[in-house]
Amino acid sequence: MNNKTYKPFPAIPPEDEPTDVKLSAAMQRLYNCWQPPGDSANELYSNFRYSRVTGIGNEVNVSRRDPTTIINVDSTYYVWYTRRDNNIPPAGLEGQTDTIPAVDWDLADIWYATSQNGFDWTEQGMAVSRAPKGEYGDRSLSTPGILVYENKYYLYFQAFTKLWEPHDCVTIGMAWSDSPDGPWHRHDQPVISRGGSNDWDGCATHDPHPIVFRDKILIYYKGSPMDKSERAFLRAQGVAIADKPTGPFIKSEFNPITNSGHETCLFPFRDGIASIISLDGPEKNTVQFSQDGINFEVKSHIVMPPVAPGAFAYDMFADNGDGRGITWGLCHIRTRSLDIPHERNEVRCFLARFDCDLSLDISKPELKGSNLRFSEATHLDSEARMELSASEKQEIIEKQGSIDRPTIGT
């Protein structure tokens, strides 16, 4: 390098991409994909803080999970969720019976709770129960999503019929009511079906998340294929579109509209839709944005996002082209037995609150920081498989001698 012609990059990045200094690929991305101030100035970047809640929190022999979008009716917050009231832990496909669940969201119903402040909740009871034996949705109802449309309320949910099948194969059902407190009237057939046996969503369509957008009702959902091989699409998200809440819902020809993500979490933002993408896929743990509701772009990378989040967005169904974002919601936290910590032996979940700054109407600099550090307990958490087990340590030691070599040059 000829230092006589070298001009260093300035300590304070210019607002616009400079043309008088050489830019590496990373610095070009800073201007083309991100913005010079970094995370602190990114509207769609946030940390997440968590709080326990009362009324629907951690309770022995009860599992609560997968909360809906939260709505506010007459100054009261409402949320719906999957509830399994059963002191028998999930037993898998082989151990399931009419009274023993296969998984944590088996033998479940849709319940609801209300709150005045979002922290203290009162469980109000069952909203939608499983169907009578032999009818659609007689085994389990789970992962609900709520829609408010023309003064009516619509719940969409996974509807399992008969004993559990391999790979969580299921369709999306629906119920409606004139009041958030019910009674709810069941629509006894799927509103969104699975794809074909070779399609990306051929096994499951679940986690429905309704939004009203550009005069249409959009239901985003998580899909997974029948093929569970290493090359198969593990999970992605799609959207089905209708003119009215009862359908017919037509799947977008662009599905899947994400290449990553587990549970769905979307909200209106400016003139488009934002989405929290977590857990699965190459773009996991990001916030993404789409102006048309179909084509999403990564806008930020986030740390420890909420699991199965249901956000409060007062304009979720406003369709006004001016989405204001979100500041809080509910999520679920899993608890399980540590007797066999590295097996899939989920026992139950409970609901918790998350707070964030993905809003245009507030400013919380304390939620825009980076360089997050975690405690010893997090790094060595055996439940999350962060700590090596004794058997894993022994296997590594046994193989290490044949893999590791003396440092080159010594």
Q: Locations of the language-model features?
A:
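Carbohydrate-active catalytic/glycan-binding domains of CAZyme proteins
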Residues: 1-410
